[in-house]
Swiss-Prot record:
One of its GO terms (molecular function) is DNA binding. It is found in: Nucleus, Nucleoplasm. It comes from Macaca fascicularis (Crab-eating macaque). Its main location: nucleus. There is a cross-link at K21 (Glycyl lysine isopeptide (Lys-Gly) (interchain with G-Cter in SUMO2)). The modification N-acetylalanine is found at A2. Belongs to the lin-9 family. GO terms for cellular component: nucleoplasm; transcription repressor complex. SMART domains: DIRP. This is Protein lin-9 homolog.
Length: 542
């Protein structure tokens, strides 16, 4: 009976059910009911504190939880304080990696790249030639297929279920099969060939090249610093310089910088320019088509070459060429869309530049040797001085020959200007003629502003008009922005005309006060780039 008296009454049980349904129990009920749920204390030999084991009922109701069997602690558990994560800005005071650790990582990376497979993986992953860059760095096949299949899909943030639905609609892709790889290689070769045709302006209809990117890279030129893939004994990437371009076989002749590699012929899809390369929109190739040379080209000035050309006899390259019978034809014959005589001059120009480059290299080495001898207070031998003087004299002769060839090439370029989309101009150029007319009007107006002429000498008035015309030409060149070799050389021709009309005693004054300043302005306008060779004073007075 005493045990029955200790059990809770019915009202207490009902109150407990109501409080349990509401989600909380009263503290009084917990204190009263917890005394009945205590279990015996198991004491062991090595257990100092008492461990309380909860009593487990055999049957449980789905309306009750384990909280009824567990002693409820009135004290709230200790909570860990939340630390607000505030993004910190990177400062210079942050700890940097240890130098030894960095060296260790760099050493391991270097050893990794020495492995042939790792080296090839880096090449395949990051090395793209100029002709392949727009093909591989654009949209992949999945993006292109997505645009064609779902043109109204403007977003790319879809759920996994939506992407799965799109993949089921598009079908299962065919990958990693021999037929797939062969098809991809064939498509890549076709795109490369189309880009080459665009670069060489051999396209009649641009609508057939819609599968190409919007920007087409321009072909590399001679003298460009490149990184090329070399195969064979020295397999890898090496830096060098382009010495020749073979458009027929789509290759470049590259001279490598590393000693012992020499010069090799590299395909264009394994040559990458070290500098940012220019591109041209594909639509521009359709707008600037070269017109037919037989119908749309204006009449040319024909040069009458001698019966036996000294170039053919003295040049071993052209003399032994199988094209000799074709090259020795008349000036009206063309080869590759250009006059044969023009191609001969370009070939000779290239050879002269190559020889001049070798002489400059020798001269640079001799200057270094002379500086070493001077620093050691050692005398310079007569043989050394003789060799140095010989190179200087040969360079002088090369410059004269180079100027003659450049003059002929410039004449042909002037004739070929209409074929390249440029407006034909008469010599002297239109800009020079306009500037001279405007200068004469300005000088005439300023001279007669007071009612009577201030300068009565006609020679002085003409000299002032010509000097004013030079200032107007410089102004037009600076404001125009589109500087070409014809307009640039017209400025030099104006200076030469003025120098030929003044007295010999005033030439030194003209050079010190006018010509040298105009030369500085020319250098600033053109940056002495590709126009410098064509802007050189003509020493060919034949």
């Amino acid at each position: 009976m005493a045990e029955l008296d200790q059990l809770p009454d019915e009202s207490s049980s009902a109150k407990a059910l109501v409080s349990l349904k509401e989600g909380s129990l009263s503290n009084t009920w917990n204190e009263k009911y917890s005394s009945l749920q205590k279990t015996p204390v198991w004491k062991g030999r090595n257990t100092s504190p008492a461990v309380e084991m909860p009593f487990r009922n055999s049957k449980r109701s789905r309306l009750f939880s384990d909280e009824d069997d567990r002693q409820i602690n009135t004290r709230s558990p200790k909570r860990n304080q939340r630390v607000a994560m505030v993004p910190q800005k990177f400062t210079a005071t942050m700890s940097t990696p240890d130098k030894k650790a960095s060296q260790k990582i760099g050493f391991r990376l270097r050893n990794l790249l020495k492995l042939p497979k790792a080296h090839k993986w880096c090449i395949y992953e990051w090395f793209y030639s100029n002709i392949d860059k727009p093909l591989f760095e654009g949209d992949n096949d999945f993006c292109v297929c997505l645009k064609e299949s779902f043109p109204n899909l403007k977003t790319r943030k879809l759920t996994r279920v939506e992407w799965g639905k799109i993949r089921r609609l598009m079908g299962k892709p065919r990958r990693c099969s021999s037929a797939f790889f062969e098809e991809e290689r064939s498509a890549l070769k076709q795109k490369r060939q189309k880009i080459r045709l665009l670069q060489q302006r051999k396209v009649a209809d641009v609508s057939q090249f819609k599968d190409l990117p919007d920007e087409i890279p321009l072909p590399l030129v001679i003298g460009t610093k490149v990184t090329a893939r070399l195969r064979g004994v020295h397999d890898g990437l090496f830096t060098g310089q382009i010495d020749a371009v073979d458009t027929l076989n789509a290759t470049y002749r590259v001279t490598f910088d590393r000693t012992g590699l020499g010069t090799h012929t590299i395909p264009d899809y394994e040559v990458l320019s070290n500098e940012p390369h220019e591109t041209m929109p594909i639509a521009a190739f359709g707008q600037k088509q070269r017109p037919s040379r037989f119908f749309m080209t204006p009449p040319r000035l024909h040069y009458t070459p001698p019966l036996q050309s000294p170039i053919m006899d003295n040049d071993p390259l052209l003399g032994q060429s199988p094209w000799r019978s074709k090259i020795s034809g008349s000036d009206t014959e063309t080869l590759g869309g250009f006059p044969v005589e023009f191609l001969i001059q370009v070939t000779r120009l290239s050879k002269i530049l190559m020889i001049k480059k070798e002489h400059i290299k020798k001269l640079r080495e001799m200057n270094t040797d002379a500086e070493k001898l001077k620093s050691y207070s050692m005398p310079i031998s007569i043989e050394f001085q003789r060799r140095y003087a010989t190179i200087v004299l040969e360079l002088e002769q090369l410059n004269k020959d180079l100027n003659k060839v450049l003059h002929k090439v410039q004449q042909y370029c002037y004739e070929l200007a209409p074929d390249q989309g440029l407006q034909p101009a008469d010599q002297p150029t239109d800009m020079r003629r306009r500037c001279e007319e405007e200068a004469q009007e300005i000088v005439r107006h300023a001279n007669s502003s007071t009612g009577q002429p201030c300068v009565e000498n006609e020679n002085l008035t003409d000299l002032i008009s010509r000097l004013t015309a030079i200032l107007l030409q410089i102004k037009c060149l600076a404001e125009g922005g589109d500087l070409n070799s014809f307009e640039f050389k017209s400025l030099t021709d104006s200076l030469n005309d003025i120098k030929s009309t003044i007295d010999a005693s005033n030439i030194s004054c003209f050079q010190n006060n006018v010509e040298i300043h105009v030369a500085h302005i020319q250098s600033g306008l053109s940056q002495m780039g590709n126009l410098h060779a064509f802007a050189a004073n003509n020493t060919n007075r034949d």
